[in-house]
Amino acid sequence: MLTTLKNAFKIKELRGKILFTFAMMVVIRIGSQLPVPGMNGEYFRSWFAEQSNGAFSLFDAITGGSFLNMSILALNINPYITSSIIMQLLTIAIPKLEEMQRDGEDGRKKIASITRYVTVVLALIQATAMAVGFGRQGLLSEYNALNIICSIATLTAGSAFLMWIGERITEKGIGNGISIVLVINIISRMPEDLGNLFQQFVFGKPPATAVLAVVIIFAVIIGMVVLVIILNDGVRRIPVQYANKVQGRKMVGGQTSNIPLKVNTAGVIPVIFAQSLISLPVYISAFAGYSGTGVWSEVLKYLDSRYWCNPGQLKYSIGLLGYIAMIIFFAYFYTSITFNPLMIADNMKKQGGFIPGIRPGKPTSEYLNKVLNYIVFIGAVGLTFVAVLPYLFSGVFNASVSFAGTSLIIIVSVVLETMKQVESQMLVRNYKGFLEK
């Protein structure tokens, strides 16, 4: 791997892309430390320590600590992620957007432009909720119209700026820019999380216990990475045979192909959807400054991941069961709108293709649907395990980490995709790359 990086730096074009990406990473980390003018950072850190919950802890991890610092990048690229998911769903639901998607490069540019506008609108809404909601509780040094407007403008501009950086990385750097931004944010929190784990389970312990703890910690991390790689790269290939045809004096066809069905077709989207729905009431209550009393207080605890796996309060595990059910549901839902067995079977029939042992047409679509449901179930269970494990770890050992669950899925997926992109560029120049190691 190091040899590959060394060889990559020998190529001027590739070296420029890598250096540009690293430069943008530095800009992002600097921006995450710049506070929003007029905001009381000490108050917010105190509030976060006393009242924060699992939803806000995850939000802070994804923003690389920008949220806790209440920096100009506090909203980060969350509005863009939400906007992209919304546009993906609308593209399938609205025929006009679907036509744009099929119009090639011009259509995709139009959809990208709409996504940017939706991102700014969502950022504006979230910034307003934060400035007004938290501002009334003491976040703003002076709660007046000028500070509110300044905070809203700064937070919205920060989110738009990160979106712009992500697009520039995609255009001039290595990998998908938005994904790179997300990974940098998550990775920036890992040293602190590892430090907390070592502080709790290693430092001050007897040598034998400390060594065992280190081995277990890294074994769990490596095991989860391997599982995520399997989920990300696992593929079931359905063989397809094409019948022979006579065109003029030539016999054509008779070729074989396959339909690749990924184990985790939906990626991390089911987890993001489930967490968004679970966290929405928690966010609204926090912005409104209402922690809840009586029944509502209990409802918030059922939705708070800190209580899900607490051995002393197992009744709140009902919230975890709801979370698991939503992940599985969204895995099937997202796959159903992105993969159409009936359309694929129809196209195969028109092209003279068939699955060996399966009749063309409806039997083929039924077979594909049956196999797809089986694969999606396996992927959903694996995805659920990876997403839920950190909550089990947190509940049993009272330790929270951001390098597990959703964060780990994102990191591994982006790193693998970026490695493949570098590998493809290296192979063009006859270099041995990552994937051969």
Regions found by a protein language model. Name each.
Residues 1-101, 105-437:
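N-terminal cationic and glycine-rich segments that engage phosphates or anionic surfaces
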